[in-house]
């Protein structure tokens, strides 16, 4: 699998991670604009696009996250096209999360106090033709500048890509996760327990259209859709289950 590391000159965390990635001899493709405002035409062809990025939140909680980009609704105020999602590689996303967690728990990094989690689909770019992921340091200016956080991300990238390129990972079921909050606690936990390879994630508050449901099942390899039964509204559960049943898509409560 060939891959492209992408950084943005507008993003301090991205610049921090880029520096560490380059220290290990890797090339990084640099954008003048925000990564979220990029699109397919900005990049050379690659089998995997990996965005080195900041994560921002009002809580300013120290967090290291992984997610695939995409807009689940008509709102594209953070880049990309309305109701469009980029392809997803659940093996990359899950191994990356597990490796971040592994390094984060090491003695030399433990005291940084970072949480590790997935995020649901949100923001651009949405028109990529091959899988992509954002790997992020959050959630404030203070954390974006931490060298050890960038080192955790860099070491995790190297381990993840080596595992994939050498096929040194176990065969497990691949899933799409629906329901729960923005940081997808249920599916983060399943991934860290090494139960499944978790790919696309969507939150409780998103009302998924048939268009998005069709993209979820066509742009990612998966064995079944996992539904966070307590993490969805009743009417949405009924709608999604009906769609999956009508299309012979395997689903399970999780």
From Swiss-Prot:
Stored InterPro entries: Deacylase_DtdA_archaea (IPR018033), DtdA (IPR007508)
UniProt keyword Cytoplasm, yes or no: no
Gene3D superfamilies: AF0625-like (3.40.630.50)
Cofactor binding note of this UniProt entry: Binds 2 Zn(2+) ions per subunit.
Biased composition, class Polar residues, residue ranges: 65-74
The protein's enzyme class: hydrolase
EC id: 3.1.1.96
Name of one Pfam family that matches: tRNA_deacylase
Keyword Electron transport included in the entry's annotation: no
Domain of life according to the entry: Archaea
Cofactors: Zn(2+)
Entry function: D-aminoacyl-tRNA deacylase with broad substrate specificity. By recycling D-aminoacyl-tRNA to D-amino acids and free tRNA molecules, this enzyme counteracts the toxicity associated with the formation of D-aminoacyl-tRNA entities in vivo.
Protein name, UniProt field: D-aminoacyl-tRNA deacylase
Source organism per UniProt: Methanococcus maripaludis (strain C7 / ATCC BAA-1331)
């Amino acid at each position: 699998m060939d891959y492209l590391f992408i950084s943005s000159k507008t993003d301090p965390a991205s610049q921090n991670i880029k520096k560490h990635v380059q220290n290990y001899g890797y090339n990084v493709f640099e954008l003048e604009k925000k990564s979220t405002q990029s699109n397919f035409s900005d990049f050379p062809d690659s089998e995997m696009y990996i965005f080195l990025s900041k994560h921002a939140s009002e809580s300013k909680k120290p967090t290291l996250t992984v997610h695939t980009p995409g807009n689940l609704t008509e709102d594209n105020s953070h880049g990309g096209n309305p109701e469009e999602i980029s392809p997803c590689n659940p093996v990359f996303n899950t191994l990356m999360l597990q490796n971040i967690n592994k390094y984060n728990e090491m003695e030399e990094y433990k005291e940084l106090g970072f949480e590790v989690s997935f995020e649901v689909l949100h923001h651009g770019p949405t028109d990529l033709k091959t899988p992509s992921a954002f790997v992020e340091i959050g959630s404030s200016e203070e954390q974006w500048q931490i060298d050890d956080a960038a080192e955790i991300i860099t070491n995790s990238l190297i381990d993840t890509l080596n595992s994939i390129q050498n096929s040194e990972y176990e065969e497990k079921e691949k899933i799409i996760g629906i329901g729960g909050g923005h940081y997808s606690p249920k599916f983060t936990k399943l991934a860290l327990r090494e139960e499944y390879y978790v790919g696309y994630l969507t939150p409780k508050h998103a009302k998924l259209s048939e268009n998005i449901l069709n993209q979820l099942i066509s742009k990612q390899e998966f064995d079944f859709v996992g539904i966070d039964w307590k993490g969805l509204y009743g009417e949405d559960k009924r709608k999604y289950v009906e769609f999956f049943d009508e299309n012979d898509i395997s689903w399970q409560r999780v």
